């Protein structure tokens, strides 16, 4: 099972990472835990919109096993998960390793490592 976490006091972590100084001033909270049908390996880049929603991908899992695109929406009691797309690994692609990018209109864009209509894996 994968978990998406929130790092509290993120600014000090960023500064610490740049200066290579260690500290223990941060804590983490699990904000969502993925089950297999919701996706597996949620270790890709995340994107946020102006409403505070978090978007990302899982490399595997989902309805067809080829990975997913998901949205997490903040609520008063936590985070609500929405499965936006489940890849088949066929012509629609699969294994979206790099997450998504969101444009000004709210459209999501991303790439997949496998599948597609071409004849070679990883793109031609």
Residue ranges and their predicted role:
Residues 2-124:
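Extracellular beta-propeller repeat domains
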């Amino acid at each position: 099972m994968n978990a998406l976490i929130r790092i509290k006091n993120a600014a000090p972590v960023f500064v610490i990472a740049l200066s290579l100084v260690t500290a223990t001033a941060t804590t983490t909270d699990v904000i969502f835990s993925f089950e297999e049908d919701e996706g597996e390996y949620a270790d890709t880049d995340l994107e946020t919109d102006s409403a505070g929603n978090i978007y990302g991908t899982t490399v595997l899992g989902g309805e067809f096993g080829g990975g997913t695109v998901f949205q997490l929406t903040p609520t008063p009691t936590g985070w609500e998960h929405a499965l936006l797309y489940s890849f088949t690994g066929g012509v629609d692609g699969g294994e979206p390793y790099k997450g998504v990018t969101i444009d000004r209109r709210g459209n999501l864009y991303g790439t997949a490592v496998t599948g597609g209509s071409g004849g070679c894996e990883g793109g031609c």
